């Protein structure tokens, strides 16, 4: 990450950070006791899910192995569901939005740790104390895209900062200051007092209280991916981690995070599990082969991956989603299909943020043949699920067209757009 070569020193958190950690842990334990959030064996929540064939599945998670999940229904019936047959399991489709409270660690591919205390950070690793059951974690710095240390309280400003830290191309480390300044240099570390950079060959200490965020060079970020199946776990605080070697022990999911640290999460703290296998491929992970954008008024806005076209998380019908394609009418996206691609599935609609003015028509074509055409949709309309056979097709085309008012507030969402293989 453009690291300057310095002696390997540990910047230990001082008394203030230690006191904050103790207070957070005490408040977390108290809130869980009051709210009764901590689950014990036999009281785990029920999850509902979606299989790749479109059928629903539900039950309490009782076992996880390398390639399947076991669910117990209310009728005490056990069902083993292989990862490759399952799209998702969710306790509540209203995934938590990314909130400005606290500090946040941004990892590649949408993984993140929300509402943490960032402690000692060197040019090799960062120590964080999570307010969730994840507790204390040490993350290799090569796995980190950035740190939001002091988040803006206004949601639009927070999303803009998040997008810069997560998606900006930068050849070196960047420090964003509360006064609007932007500093670049080689990262040396941070503690509870200062962020340390090497600027023009000289070490510089920057008062941490004035630092909003730190972004690392994304070209040298390395995030291990398992050779076969793994799980994405989403927690109630909005954190999401990819994990391997998952299993269930006494009402907890025990696993290894993709950055190598063992974790334990009570099932009651999980709100969603996404099996990641080669059977379900999200279009946000596939390169679009061709796209065309033509606005009605002003300059068109191109496709955004895993964000709405104006840079926010997806919200459809009051529900929040992590993955998808954000477009604006009029947009055409073309994907060359691969041998083994069987079905295309997505949830489409106009994002809740569009308000009453947005109006969009969604169309799906295969090999230029119309397969789906929706009526004009606004944010007041319920999202529509699309599920079509593409096994004989070579080209998948997704189109958003002008509805009733040109492209005014046309925030067109293709939520969880995916190929079933």
What are the language-model segments listed below?
Residues 1-14:
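N-terminal secretory signal peptides that target proteins for export/translocation
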Residues 6, 236-240, 343:
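Short, solvent-exposed linear motifs at loop/edge-of-secondary-structure regions
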Residues 17-32:
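Bacterial N-terminal signal peptides
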Residues 33-38:
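Boundary at the C-terminal end of the N-terminal hydrophobic targeting segment
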Residues 39-41, 95-97, 164-167, 299-305, ...:
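Short low-complexity stretches enriched in small and charged residues
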Residues 41-45, 51-280, 335-336:
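Extended non-catalytic domains of envelope/secretory-pathway proteins
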Residues 48-49, 393:
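Long alpha-helical scaffolds
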Residues 208-231, 249-421:
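Gly-Asp-aromatic-enriched flexible segments
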């Amino acid at each position: 990450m453009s690291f300057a070569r310095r002696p390997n020193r540990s910047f230990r958190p001082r008394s203030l950070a230690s006191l904050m950690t103790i207070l957070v842990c005490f408040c977390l334990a108290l809130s869980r006791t009051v709210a009764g959030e901590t689950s014990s064996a036999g009281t785990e929540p029920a999850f509902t899910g979606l299989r790749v064939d479109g059928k629903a599945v539900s039950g309490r998670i009782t076992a996880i192995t390398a390639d399947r999940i076991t669910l117990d229904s209310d009728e005490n019936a056990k069902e083993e569901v292989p990862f490759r047959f399952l799209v998702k399991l969710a306790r509540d489709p209203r995934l938590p939005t990314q909130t400005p409270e606290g500090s946040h660690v941004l990892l590649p591919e949408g993984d993140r740790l929300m509402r943490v205390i960032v402690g000692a950070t060197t040019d090799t690793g960062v120590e964080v104390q999570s307010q969730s059951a994840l507790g204390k974690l040490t993350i290799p710095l090569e796995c980190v895209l950035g740190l939001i240390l002091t988040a803006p309280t206004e949601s639009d400003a927070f999303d803009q900062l998040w997008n810069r830290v997560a998606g900006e191309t930068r050849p070196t480390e960047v420090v964003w200051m509360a006064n609007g300044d932007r500093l670049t240099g080689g990262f040396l570390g941070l503690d509870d007092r200062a962020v340390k950079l090497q600027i023009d060959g000289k070490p510089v200490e920057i008062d941490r209280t004035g630092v909003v965020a730190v972004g690392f060079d994304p070209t040298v970020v390395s995030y291990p991916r398992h050779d076969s199946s793994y799980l994405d776990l989403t927690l109630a605080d909005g954190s999401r981690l990819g994990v391997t070697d998952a299993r269930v022990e006494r009402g907890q999911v025990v696993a290894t995070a993709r950055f190598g640290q063992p974790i334990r999460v009570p099932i009651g703290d999980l709100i969603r599990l996404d099996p990641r296998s080669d059977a379900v491929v999200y279009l946000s992970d596939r390169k679009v082969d061709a796209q065309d954008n033509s606005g009605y008024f002003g300059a068109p806005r191109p496709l955004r991956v895993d964000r709405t076209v104006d840079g926010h998380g997806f919200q459809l019908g009051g529900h929040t989603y992590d993955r998808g394609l954000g477009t604006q009418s009029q947009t055409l996206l073309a994907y060359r299909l691969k041998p083994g691609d069987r079905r295309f599935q997505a949830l489409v609609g106009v994002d809740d943020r569009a308000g009453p003015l947005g109006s969009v028509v969604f169309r799906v074509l295969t090999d230029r043949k119309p397969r789906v055409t929706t009526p004009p949709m606004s944010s007041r309309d319920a999202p529509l699920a699309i599920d079509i056979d593409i096994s004989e097709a070579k080209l998948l085309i997704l189109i958003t067209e002008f509805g009733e008012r040109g492209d005014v507030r046309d925030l067109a969402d293709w939520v969880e757009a995916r190929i079933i293989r």
